[in-house]
């Protein structure tokens, strides 16, 4: 995932959720993913999937059972 893609996805998240709180950071361990933050809180990872020339991005968010206690 390159910096242009990260900027575009970051803008997409902020526009879709009507905020400026989203930030994407390149995942240092995997060049095909980026970390997604909302107001400095880690939300999950977004992965680039390039299959048969079609590019898609998949967002993965893990919710721990203990996180649901405050919901």
Regions found by a protein language model. Name each.
Residues 1-71:
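Terminal leader/tail segments of proteins
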């Amino acid at each position: 995932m390159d910096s242009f893609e990260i900027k575009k996805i970051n803008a997409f998240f902020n526009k879709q959720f009507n905020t400026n709180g989203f930030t994407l950071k390149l995942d240092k361990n995997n060049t095909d993913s980026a970390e997604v933050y909302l107001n400095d809180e880690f939300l999950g990872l977004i992965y680039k999937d390039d299959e048969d020339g079609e590019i898609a991005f998949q967002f993965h968010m893990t919710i721990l059972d203990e996180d649901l206690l405050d919901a």
